[in-house]
Structure formats: C-alpha cells, structure tokens
C-alpha cells in the first residue's frame, strides 16, 4: 500500500490513466487490508480505551473517511477506468474533495505507518535473520 500511495502522489509524472489504474490497485489493497484486519475491526467496541488506543482508533477512522472520499471523488473524476459510467457533473467539487482527501490521507497514513514502525521492523528482522531451518 505504501508503494501504491507513493506512486499516486506524483500525478503529473505517472499520467492520468496510470494514476487511475494505480488508484484501483490501492482500492483493492485497501479492501484486502481491511479483510485481513477484520479481527481488529470487530474488537473496536470491546476492551478498555487507553489514550493511545483512542488516538489510533480516531486516526484509523479519519484515514477511512479520506480513503472513501478519495475513492468516490476519483470515480466521479475518472476518464479511463470508469469511463463507462454516465457523467452527471460535480467535477469541481469532486476535484477539490479528491485533493483534500488525498493530501490529508497521505499525512494520516504516514502517522499510522509511523505508529506501527516498530512492529514492522520486528517482523522484518524476524524474516531477514538467518534461521536454522534456512541455513545449511
């Protein structure tokens, strides 16, 4: 998801069609991410809410809103992937919403990634260290 997000940001460099297709890939990864994390989503109403948990839950809720805003506005603005859909106007609002959600989503996802950085490093170390099973 991080690579797709980074590829989506330089719109002028990747071009309109590639931007839309990468956006569709990001949507697929977004859905897969939530399917894989459904246990966490189901556990949101349960348990004790510490200040850290409140911050993380709020952050994830805001990211979700930004992603939905980016996706809906992206579909309205689409000229390639969703060209078959009828056009009803609202391009100016959709364009502003798309930019707003994209940039705030980038900031919020960076915070989200930063809050999980130690977990990512631990997983990477575990998979990159020599293992008795993988060595001769």
Protein language model annotation of sequence segments:
Residues 1-136:
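Membrane-embedded alpha-helical bundles that constitute the cytochrome b-like, heme-associated redox core
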């Amino acid at each position: 998801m991080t690579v797709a997000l980074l590829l989506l940001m330089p719109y002028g460099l990747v071009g309109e069609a590639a931007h839309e297709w990468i956006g569709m890939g990001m949507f697929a990864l977004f859905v897969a991410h939530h399917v894989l994390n459904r246990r966490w989503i189901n556990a949101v109403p349960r348990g004790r809410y510490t200040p850290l948990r409140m911050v993380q839950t709020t952050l994830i809720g805001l990211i979700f809103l930004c992603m939905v805003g980016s996706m809906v506005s992206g579909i309205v603005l689409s000229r390639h992937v969703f060209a078959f859909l009828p056009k009803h106007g609202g391009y100016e609002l959709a364009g502003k919403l798309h930019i707003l959600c994209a940039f705030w989503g980038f900031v919020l996802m960076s915070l989200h990634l930063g809050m999980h950085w130690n977990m990512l490093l631990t997983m990477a170390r575990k998979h990159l260290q020599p293992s008795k099973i993988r060595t001769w």
